[in-house]
């Protein structure tokens, strides 16, 4: 075989063809150098924007240089796997305070195993059909700056909400990587930023988690608060959470580029009607029900008690029958630890306060109408 075979565009074409056959929707190749992004990462960590996600601080040397993670790495093959589910009526659910909003990526199957399996198939095929080179696959499972690597590989550009954007898929996709010692040609097609002057993603954030464009303060991000955060959620952020009980999609839902996203892999379509569940219904799940209905689901990452803690806040922001909701909340008091109890008591107080305010408003409106009806007609004075 010609020694320059690996530099042929035909190799990339065959690689892309196989990737599409395996269900990936885009693929690109880049070198592993991410040095230009290291200072930004260090500043983000120094600002404390990572919250309790201490793993960002660990193995910082590996994030700076992927060749230390996998010695001998010459190229990073970055892949895209679209997940947009169909017909989820997400805006209607988000606007209904009595329904549970679960982030779109978490409505179906957890992507990690599926991504790794397909990447492994791709790597094995490459070694068998093209050339026997070493590789390792990653799916959000290693200290890699995967968004920056994907951007370098031509899969899109990083938007002001810090997510990777593609003209063909918006931001509704997962990323995976295959690190190899094969000196493949790098992708020569790169996306320039197409955000322009748009700030829709920054303006919509319920908790003001973006201190500036391209910067995310995770400690205020609802996705972080409902999945990674341990302990009570800060009280000032509970009401803005609304009915978002696992993740948040607001910054993606308003992004103009997401209008062009195609429906994703069927593996990520909703299971157990998670796209249309009332808050009270989910809060009533036993742990056995939770484990059964979230098998193979991203919801498992939060765990049963954390999920209840999030649901309690959602119920505190709900508008349905106050007494019924309070009774539902009280059914879990004293059973699953102090954080859940704190959230439940906050929710009950919020519901009672809102009920009192509504009663006062109704009484005031009634008195106003009564006074208007009793007032003499001007012609009778």
Where are the regions a protein language model picked out?
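Auxiliary alpha/beta "docking" domains used to position bulky ligands
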Residues: 1-194, 233, 242, 370-372, ...
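Iron-sulfur cluster-binding cysteine motifs and their immediate structural context
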Residues: 21-24, 200-224, 244-268
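Flavin-dependent oxidoreductase catalytic cores
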Residues: 189-190, 197-200, 210-213, 300
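A beta-strand-loop signature enriched in Asp, Gly, Thr, and Trp
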Residues: 222-242, 253-289
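Amphipathic alpha-helical scaffolding segments comprising HEAT/armadillo-like alpha-solenoid repeats
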Residues: 291-292, 320-333, 354-365
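Structural detector for internal amphipathic alpha-helices that build alpha-solenoid repeat scaffolds
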Residues: 308-320, 341-351
């Amino acid at each position: 075989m010609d020694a320059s075979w690996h530099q042929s565009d035909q190799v990339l074409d065959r690689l892309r063809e196989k990737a599409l056959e395996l269900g990936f929707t885009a693929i690109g190749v880049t070198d592993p150098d991410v040095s230009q992004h290291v200072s930004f990462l260090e500043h983000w960590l120094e600002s404390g924007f990572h919250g309790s996600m201490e793993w960002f601080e660990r193995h910082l040397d590996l994030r700076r240089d992927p060749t230390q993670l996998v010695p001998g790495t010459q190229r990073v093959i970055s892949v895209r796997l679209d997940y947009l589910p169909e017909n989820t009526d997400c805006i209607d659910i988000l606007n209904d305070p009595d329904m549970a909003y679960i982030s779109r990526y978490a409505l179906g199957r957890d992507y990690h195993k599926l991504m790794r399996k397909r990447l492994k198939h791709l790597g094995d095929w490459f070694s068998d059909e093209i050339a026997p080179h070493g590789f390792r696959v990653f799916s959000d499972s290693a200290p890699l700056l995967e968004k920056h690597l994907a951007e370098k590989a031509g899969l899109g550009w990083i938007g002001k909400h810090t997510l990777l954007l593609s003209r063909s898929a918006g931001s509704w996709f997962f990323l995976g990587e295959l690190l190899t010692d094969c000196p493949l040609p790098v992708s020569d097609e790169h996306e320039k930023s197409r955000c322009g002057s748009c700030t829709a993603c920054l303006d919509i954030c319920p908790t003001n988690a973006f201190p500036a464009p391209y910067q995310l303060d995770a400690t205020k991000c609802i996705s972080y608060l409902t999945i990674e955060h341990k302990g009570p959620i800060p009280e000032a952020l509970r009401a803005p959470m609304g009915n978002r009980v696992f993740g948040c999609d607001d910054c993606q839902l308003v992004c103009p580029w997401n209008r062009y996203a195609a429906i994703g892999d069927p593996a990520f379509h909703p299971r157990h009607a998670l796209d249309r569940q009332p808050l009270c219904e989910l809060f009533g799940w036993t742990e056995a029900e939770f484990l059964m209905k979230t098998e193979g689901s991203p919801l498992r990452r939060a765990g049963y008690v954390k999920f209840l803690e999030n649901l309690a806040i959602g119920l505190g922001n709900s508008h349905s029958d106050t007494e019924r909701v309070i009774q539902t909340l009280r059914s879990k008091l004293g059973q699953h630890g102090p954080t859940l109890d704190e959230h439940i008591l906050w929710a009950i107080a919020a519901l009672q306060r809102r009920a009192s305010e509504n009663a006062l408003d109704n009484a005031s409106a009634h008195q106003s109408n009564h006074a208007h009806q009793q007032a003499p007609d001007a012609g009778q004075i």
